[in-house]
Amino acid sequence: AASDVYKRQVVKWPDGWGVGVRPTRFERQPVAKAELPDDAVVKLIYFHQDQVIRLPEGAERVASSDFCDEAGFTLCTTDGVQTVLCLQGHPEFDAGYSTALLDSIESKVGTDRTKAARASLAKKTDSTLVAGWIKQFFTIAAQRRGWAA
């Protein structure tokens, strides 16, 4: 995890794996002019056991969830440009890929949690919206550094 680079602020969560489609509450825009839903909640596929328990120095939380307090954060480099965006949810995952992952580690996740996760994968996610934010985030970072974007 990116946060792990910054002073071991990541742990294996004692409550086990966070898997399936989960709501993520955005406390602020992850990128300038990001269009947040009216309730500031987006649904993403989660697939993790590690969690950030303390944000790195200089990081700003942008999101939390019922399973992970630090579900998203941004971090500036020493020149003040936001160049790190971390999200606990996976906008790049789809239901098929997540089902295959669940099949491969069901014994670690547990039968009940796996069953609930599989059922949740039928829900619509906001992955396309979040992917647009990620693209915008890095486009802005590149422009601020004078890189072609």
Show where each model-derived region lies.
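Post-Walker A helix-loop "phosphate-sensing" segment adjacent to the P-loop in P-loop NTPases
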Residues: 7-11
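Long, hydrophobic, well-ordered secondary-structure blocks that form the structural core
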Residues: 13, 18-24
